[in-house]
Amino acid sequence: MLRTLVVFAPIIAALAWVIFNIQKPAREQFNRDFLGKKD
């Protein structure tokens, strides 16, 4: 099980990175709203 986790961890990290890059404009908008509300 641990070996499987070691194998899939980089794959999951890569997918998360791709999703992060795709949603970057949405994240920037979220950060703008969040920082605006944080004041």
UniProtKB/Swiss-Prot annotation:
| Single biological process term from Gene Ontology | photosynthesis
The regions listed as transmembrane in this protein's record are: 4-22
Localization annotation: Cellular thylakoid membrane
* CC annotations in GO: photosystem II; plasma membrane-derived thylakoid membrane
Q: Name one GO molecular function term.
A: manganese ion binding
Q: Which InterPro entries match?
A: PSII_PsbY (IPR009388)
Q: Specify the protein's topology with respect to the membrane.
A: Single-pass membrane protein
Pfam families per the record? PsbY (PF06298)
Where's it mainly located?
membrane
User: What keywords tag this UniProt record?
Assistant: Membrane, Photosynthesis, Photosystem II, Thylakoid, Transmembrane, Transmembrane helix
The domain of life is Bacteria
Looking up HAMAP family in the UniProt record yields: PSII_PsbY (MF_00717)
The UniProt similarity line reads: Belongs to the PsbY family.
Subunit arrangement? Answer: PSII is composed of 1 copy each of membrane proteins PsbA, PsbB, PsbC, PsbD, PsbE, PsbF, PsbH, PsbI, PsbJ, PsbK, PsbL, PsbM, PsbT, PsbX, PsbY, Psb30/Ycf12, peripheral proteins PsbO, CyanoQ (PsbQ), PsbU, PsbV and a large number of cofactors. It forms dimeric complexes.
Which NCBIfam families does UniProt cross-reference here? Answer: PRK13240.1
Record function comment: Loosely associated component of the core of photosystem II (PSII), it is not always seen in crystals. PSII is a light-driven water plastoquinone oxidoreductase, using light energy to abstract electrons from H(2)O, generating a proton gradient subsequently used for ATP formation.
The identity of this protein, by name, is Photosystem II reaction center protein Y
Give the source species.
Prochlorococcus marinus (strain MIT 9515)
The primary gene name is psbY
